[in-house]
Amino acid sequence: MLTAPDPYNNFRDANQLTDILQLARLVVLVFDFHQLVKLKSFWTPALLKRITAGYPVAHFQLTEQMRVGDAAVSNWIDQFVRGRITPLPHPEKFDFRVFADGQPMYRLIQQRDAEVGLSRLIATADYPFTVLDKKTWYVTAGSLRLPWDKINFTDRPWAQRPETLHEVGSIYTIQGFDLNYAGVILGPSLGYNAEKDRLTVNLSQYQDKEAFKKRPDLADTQAAKIAIVMNAINILLKRAKYGLYLYAADPALRQRLLQAHDLGRE
């Protein structure tokens, strides 16, 4: 839901939830602060509390997710998007791996797609692109070079079209959609601080400038932008039911993830 005017989407008021509350007798609001990927739709708990003040509100906490096929992997992802790298779990019924190069990861995704379908490469928005021109924009992962996804003018979801096995999907392609296996390319905006053993975010590397359009009402825009990057990563990492494969563009992060992969097997 928008938290700022957005003429592109024909919304000119200040907040969509405010308008909905004024029009509806009953509102069922399913909310996840970790799925917000643009400043124009960025919420904080304080903002949600302020907008709903004066209305009777009942809260229900959803505690189970049905997408990622293993709780230990889901917990690992939760730690990762908070900046921590822990040893990778290696459950029997979920294939979780880190790759030193994108090419073997892509070959495995192709194999999985032949076996069970719905297996695709997806990436963070760290590689240049524009939406409406006819130029082909590419994502690189070591020796791998594949084009970004194209605008989908069909009724079929991106991952269900066979030709998209040879593309790299984005957050906008895949959000809200399930995969069986996902190969995730973590681009150069995500790095690693060895001294602190923590993830770092380099906002200058993030190519989705539309996500960062100005919000004058946000007190800490820098923190909100970092949250948006990590939210996008959270979404990408939680698409797959049976297997998740990782490649990191940053050499230090890639090495740390490979180490975490091996530590998980000890």
Predicted features along the sequence, with ranges:
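A conditional alpha-helix N-cap/helix-loop micro-motif detector
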Residues: 9-13, 102, 161, 225-226
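C-terminal accessory regions
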Residues: 26-28, 162, 167-266
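Acidic/glycine-enriched edge-of-secondary-structure segments
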Residues: 2-8, 89-96, 216-220
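Short, contiguous acidic/charged loop-to-helix segments that flank catalytic cores in large enzymes
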Residues: 4-11, 37, 153-157, 172-174, ...
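Conserved helicase/translocase motor-coupling segment
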Residues: 36-44, 54-198
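Short, well-ordered beta-to-alpha junction loops that form the rim of enzyme active sites
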Residues: 32, 125-128, 249-250
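Signature of the SF2 helicase/ATPase Hel1-core->accessory helical subdomain module
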Residues: 1-61, 194
